[in-house]
Regions:
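Phosphate-coordination loops involved in phosphoryl transfer and adenosine-cofactor binding
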Residues: 3-5, 79, 144-147, 207
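Short hydrophobic core segments
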Residues: 9, 100-110, 151, 232-242, ...
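A Rossmann-like FAD-binding core segment of flavoenzymes
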Residues: 31, 76-94, 100, 167-264
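Glycine-rich dinucleotide-binding loop and its adjacent helix/turn
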Residues: 109-167, 263
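FAD-site-proximal beta/loop scaffold in flavoenzymes
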Residues: 122-144, 215-225, 229-303
Length: 305
């Protein structure tokens, strides 16, 4: 029997879990091709913070090594960002010109960091915190620079601040709210957490809005200016002010999106040949960012595929 061609765009935790579930059900049904925008096999993004802090290595957080893909007959194309979906010819095209035809297409493009729309947000030294490349950039910067500013006092921002402090940087966290983790903690608990982190040497600017990132003409960030006029030095600025579903590819192909790629209860998009799982998908008005519901999506999607 001729195998059905399944192409997956994205090589993260939700997408690869879908493949694992699919292989459990029937390992011979699909001819699978995976495009990964990063030059790495699937790894655990949740553990990037221990890597930043020097508690784990990149190798230790890999979930599916290259041998796993080969053993399961999966064609893995790393460092290939897909830039086009041709829904008529049923094929995807990557930035380097490589392409693959599909009978079924699985979009697992994840999310992208929200970069504040302020002057200087494209300067060298201004990064999000989402992947191995971001983590490595922070580790490299900590070796040669001193001052880090983390924008965002949520969990991700505090993990970045803690890791950078452990790497020896002088760290300031800037947060819009009156206290840290305001969605998870009340004021009292937030202030207790702040005190514990201040005891580790991390500084805080709460109820503060970032107005501009400055470079003094060098092309690299050197300072942060706030809405009250204060300026502090910054060799590194980490944007940890939230994420957005990565829908750019789907939208360019005319697939309906609204704060995520719109999917039904079987994770099918408005194009019946195309599915979406993970942080890029919007199911009944919700784009999930936690692992447990994303793994449930993977199971449902695999069963329907």
């Amino acid at each position: 029997m001729k195998k059905i061609k399944l192409v997956m765009v994205g090589n993260g935790m939700a997408g690869v879990r879908t493949l694992e579930e699919l292989l459990k059900l029937n390992s011979d049904f699909y001819d699978i091709t995976v495009f990964g925008a990063e030059p790495h096999p699937n790894y655990n993004r949740i553990l990037l913070s221990p890597v930043l802090a020097g508690e784990q290595t990149f190798e230790e957080i890999v979930l599916n090594d290259l041998n796993w893909y080969a053993k399961n007959g999966i064609k893995l194309l790393l460092d290939r960002k897909v830039v086009q979906i041709d829904r008529v010819r049923r094929r995807v095209v990557a930035a380097d010109g490589s392409e693959a035809e599909y009978d079924r297409l699985l979009l697992a493009t994840g999310s992208v960091p929200f970069i504040l729309p302020i002057p200087g947000n494209r300067l060298q030294g201004v990064i999000g915190y989402r992947d191995i490349a971001d983590t490595q950039a922070m580790i490299d910067c900590a070796r040669t620079h001193s001052h880090a500013v983390v924008i965002g006092g949520g969990l991700l921002g505090l993990e970045a601040a803690n890791g950078l402090k452990q790497r020896g940087m002088d760290v300031t966290v800037v947060h819009l709210s009156d206290w840290l983790l305001e969605r998870q903690l009340d004021r009292t608990a937030g202030k207790l957490l702040q005190g514990a982190l201040e005891a580790r040497g991390i500084r805080f600017r709460l109820n503060t809005q970032t107005q501009e990132l400055m470079d003094n003409g060098s092309g690299r960030v050197c300072a942060v200016q706030f809405n009250d006029g204060d300026v502090i030095p910054a060799d590194l600025v980490v944007m940890a002010a939230g994420i957005r579903p990565n829908t750019e590819l789907a939208e360019s192909a005319g697939i309906p999106c609204n704060r995520g790629i719109l999917v039904n209860d079987t994770l099918q998009t408005y194009d019946p040949r195309i599915y979406a799982v993970g942080e890029c998908a919007n199911h009944r008005g919700i784009a999930y960012g936690l692992v447990a519901p994303l793994f449930e999506q993977a199971k449902v999607c695999a069963n329907h595929l």
